[in-house]
Amino acid sequence: MKAKQIPVMVSLSLSLLTLAACKPDAPVAETPAAADASAASDRDAAEPAYPTRAYFGDTHVHTGWSADAGLDGSSLGPEEAFRFARGDEVKSNSGQIAKLKRPLDWMVITDHSDGMGTISEIRAGNPEMIGTDEFLEKMNAALKTSDVKLRNTVMLEAVTRQVNRTLPKAMMDPKWMVSAWKHTVEIADRYNDPGKFSAMIGYEWTVNADDGNNLHRNVVLRDGADKAGQVLPLTTFETEDPEGLWKWMAEYEAKTGGKALAIPHNGNLSNGRMFEETRFDKSPMTREYATARQRWEPLFEVTQMKGQSESHPGLSPKDEFADWDLWDRGNLDAVPKKPGMVRTEYWRESLKSGLRLQGTLGANPFKYGANAGTDTHTGLTAAEENNYWGKLASIEPSPDRMKRPFNKQFASFETAASGYMGVWAKANTREALWDAMQRRETFATTGARMTVRFFGG
């Protein structure tokens, strides 16, 4: 299984050269001495004049505090997620002992903003939830059962309801988010250890336009709880237009003095919408739009557990590895893909489109650097095929996990053990890592800690 992983990682690296650019809080234990020099050698947070090493981490981690993850059976929260990422041994959602072979240098927890804070209330049987809607009662029952199939069925129904905008009104009340977000940012601050392990703050804004076209963005903040805690994450209940997200980010920066960036992901499940050459409302792109998109979205996630969005055999027919981890059957809610859609779904093609649009608009809306994350919904950021803890709690290691379905279109065995991002930062701190992401001094791998660097100008 490991042998097949080498070609795609090389392919991703070569593509970079073309770019030219809520549970009770537990006490924080001391980090054990890490065997891996990648995470342990830098004990000094002082910044050199220029980056001298790549720091590896994950910008896309969901815990049991995300509604879909919790429904599927994930019980691990941000505490366990950060501990696992920095190299600690933790107990998985299925009760097994889990540990990374090599610790990460940094990680961002990106629980969904939609429904944030609701799972604990539904599980507890809060009367403001239970009894107000039949589906909430079904969710409560699923959260209490050990029936994996039932939990997965209810989880998939919740995803479909989010896609179709038919979630119960009680789940859309922002008051549930207040406590969950407060705990999230405080936990990140406690685990943040500059120079050793950077615990970064973020969330996922989960737009599924037109009945399931994946236009999700992960929002990554440069800051700590003192600034992040002054606001609440944006939800798709408020707006589904990316320009609305960019407005939220601008307001966040103006209010707090902090910094924010967004990372789109899974263009492969967008049914042609990720890199379409119009605005969200189908009106023509303008120079102002292209400039704003480049300003707020410096990176694009090219690989993760739901397949790769780097390229496609139909777009790169001479690339024998373009069919690696291919998820091209339809969108997130299994609406089938139509001919021509793949042209505006993949990163490599978008780089060419962006250069062409630069000539007509005077700005490049698709000036994306390379990002990779796992999109794990277990709290366990594992991107190794021989230490793969699954995309969902229901498909953690077990004798029959490969027989289980993932969703309406894919089986669990089709999920990919991927990926991590290397960041050429001046130091292992939130600020230095974020600044490097903004500069696009990054590269994506399917999990290997290879080091790739390109100089141009």
Question: What residue spans do the PLM features occupy?
Answer:
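Bacterial N-terminal signal peptides that target proteins for export
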Residues: 1-10
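Extended, charged catalytic domains and RNA/DNA-binding interfaces, predominantly
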Residues: 22, 27-457
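Bacterial N-terminal signal peptides
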Residues: 9-18
